[in-house]
Design a protein with these regions (language model features):
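Intrinsically disordered regions, especially transient/low-confidence alpha-helical propensity segments
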Residues: 2-4, 12, 69, 94, ...
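Cytoplasmic/organellar membrane-interface segments at the starts of transmembrane helices
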Residues: 242-251, 304, 308-424
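Hydrophobic transmembrane alpha-helices and their helix-loop junctions in integral membrane proteins
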Residues: 1-3, 13-334
Length: 424
């Protein structure tokens, strides 16, 4: 019960943080919707633990591991767990609270909830499903893969049409939670079939994306807070021209957008690239249903990644480029150095992971080995810092070479433009 007690305590603290500005009726509404969904999730988890404890009623994790159960009862518990953690993480269709709470909460609170508290749900899923349920059946993976793919697509489709900046980020969280669940579902499928190396690849991709999303989403919320503090505007349609008035914020926000759009050489690309490598291994699965489901999830994942990149191009272009479209945007001023420093610190880590991902992959590998029974080859001693999660012949990535190519291409384009069309 310690797990559920801490789970409920986190829900209450999150509710209180959303109510920081409790004078607004929409904030109170968002907070109570969140509390309602959190209570539903706790009920689902309580029922799941009741099934796992069996007739003995032993709720210690060690006792649950030793309790014998058939795969169908464990599968029912899995369904309850997915609904329980999904209501906390923001999986579709349990996401209704998320686009309400993130815009209602102060930006630093939204950064904390998106970067940390929603990730506790991922921990809960891993702890229960991979640790307590026992050896998995292959069909257990169908639910997380399906809900993950639906969440990724629904999240990005709603994000791309939003007018309010923090709502864009909220729906972007739904998309990324979906990506994480696709990876965890694949890890379950591979583990159930005794494919330790592909399971380690998918699981590593999931954990790395958990970290990456926490970093770049927190920096984006800090950036959104800087924009709102400088202009008082929440709608991106009333912004524009901020790159001239807030140049430091503009550069940092651009880097964060590149990271969440999964473009190299930032960290978001690495975890999504690893997941694509895992999807490419699914034809080796023996079950025809999984061989059909995994490519469909891969197509949805690729589509959501492309739409996500378009979404953040739209957000950045409307907010920072062009001319100001309101008086408040015309009089915007750069935020203080402490706010900029918070964004900069997170983005330095994002860039470091993107350039040298092998260090983080090697740090995750022992966890993957203990959970799925396999690990990726050691990466950070690879030649020229190239990562090759399977074999160098099959696939490899070098963040430094990509960064060098981007830098040379950018400087060359800049030189050509100014050479051919010099300023008068």
């Amino acid at each position: 019960f310690t797990f559920l007690w801490a789970w409920e305590l986190m829900s209450v603290f999150s509710w209180a943080l959303v109510l920081t500005h409790d004078y607004a009726s929409e904030n109170r509404h968002a907070a109570y919707i969140y509390l309602l969904m959190a209570s539903f999730g706790s009920l689902m988890l309580l029922m799941a633990f009741g099934l796992l404890a069996g007739a003995e009623g032993a709720y210690q994790f060690a006792s649950i591991r030793e309790t014998s159960r058939d795969e169908w009862r464990a599968g029912i518990a899995l369904v309850l767990v997915v609904f329980g953690v999904g209501s906390k993480a923001g999986l579709v269709p349990l996401h209704i609270w998320l686009p309400l709470t993130d815009p209602a909460a102060p930006s630093h609170v939204a950064a904390l909830m998106s970067g940390v508290m929603k990730k506790v749900a991922i921990y809960g899923f891993i702890r229960i499903v991979f640790d307590l349920l026992g050896p998995p059946a292959y069909w257990w993976s169908i639910e997380p893969i399906t809900l993950g793919a639906v969440s990724a697509l629904v999240g990005v489709l709603f994000a791309i049409i939003q007018d309010e900046l923090k709502k864009v980020l909220a729906y972007g969280t739904i998309e990324n939670i979906g990506i994480i669940f696709i990876a965890l579902g694949l890890a379950l499928a591979f583990k159930a079939n005794g494919m330790a190396a592909p399971a380690a690849l998918a699981f590593t991709a999931a954990l790395l994306h958990v970290l990456n999303h926490a970093l770049f989403k927190a920096s984006l919320f800090f950036g959104a807070g800087a924009i709102i503090a400088a202009t008082g505007e929440k709608s991106i349609e009333r912004l524009g021209g901020l790159i001239k008035l807030m140049p430091k914020s503009a550069i940092l926000f651009l880097i964060a957008c590149i990271a969440i759009a999964a473009l190299p050489p930032l960290n978001g690309f690495v975890s999504e690239w690893l997941l694509f490598q895992g999807i490419l291994l699914t034809p080796a699965l023996p079950q025809w249903g999984l061989r059909l489901l995994a490519p469909v999830a891969g197509i949805v994942f690729a589509l959501s990644a492309a739409l996500g990149a378009a979404c953040y191009v739209r957000v950045y272009g409307i907010s920072f480029l062009g001319r100001a479209r309101s008086k408040s945007a015309e009089h915007a001023r750069e935020v203080d150095d402490w706010s900029l420093g918070a964004m900069l610190g997170l983005l330095v880590i994002c860039l470091s992971i993107g350039l040298v991902p092998g260090l983080m992959i090697d740090a995750i590998s022992p966890v993957a080995e203990s959970v799925v029974g396999g690990r990726l080859p050691v990466q950070h001693f690879s030649q020229w810092l190239t990562i090759a999660p399977i074999t160098e012949v099959r696939s490899s990535y070098n963040g430094f070479l990509v960064a060098l190519f981007v830098m040379i291409s950018g400087l060359t384009a800049y030189w050509i433009v100014h050479r051919l069309w010099p300023r008068p």
